Design a protein with these regions (language model features):
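Extended catalytic cores of very large enzyme megasubunits
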Residues: 1-168
């Protein structure tokens, strides 16, 4: 946070925008990486998250190889958060955390892959299409959809409901 705040401290009459990149790096090294549950591979991760009721059973819709294809596509983009605030917001509000210690079970790329797989409902080509749009930041679903898709213990996927009401 200190590095992020230094952005507004002018040096030679210019904002220190590079401090934001330093803040993102520091946030990952000092906080995110230390508080993320480590899995040896995707199969171990998916099995754990499904068996412990964090995710719905994606194996009912996809083979492990299909799931792996979507994750591989997303991770191949080598996504990096553009700012400290975006990274902080994702990990504070959207990343899946474990029940006991609040450790992270997902990275941003994992959330993208899971949302894509969920929305495609078994159509791996659609899942890859969605994943491509999301990781390239061409489209961002509404908060409830991005937050809850694919989670076993989730809320609604929409942020509002339209009801028809009579005039009496």
């Amino acid at each position: 946070i200190y590095l992020n705040n230094e952005i507004m401290m002018k040096k030679d009459d210019e904002f220190q925008l590079h401090k934001d990149k330093e803040a993102v790096y520091s946030y990952f090294v000092d906080y995110v990486n230390k508080n993320t549950v480590f899995f040896h591979n995707l199969k171990e991760k998916m099995d754990y998250l499904i068996e412990n009721d964090y995710y719905i059973n994606f194996y009912d819709m996809y083979t492990h190889e299909q799931i792996k294809e979507v994750f591989r596509l997303v991770y191949s983009k080598k996504f990096r958060f553009a700012s400290f605030m975006s990274a902080s917001k994702f990990y504070q509000s959207y990343a899946l955390k474990d029940d006991s210690e609040g450790r992270f079970l997902e990275r941003y790329e994992d959330r993208i892959a899971i949302v894509s797989l969920y929305l495609a409902q078994g159509n791996v080509d659609k899942a890859k299409e969605y994943a491509q749009m999301l990781i390239n930041q061409e489209y961002q679903p509404a908060t409830p959809t991005f937050l809850n898709s694919g989670k076993k213990r989730s809320g609604e996927l929409v942020s509002c409901f339209l009801d028809e009401m009579g005039d009496n």
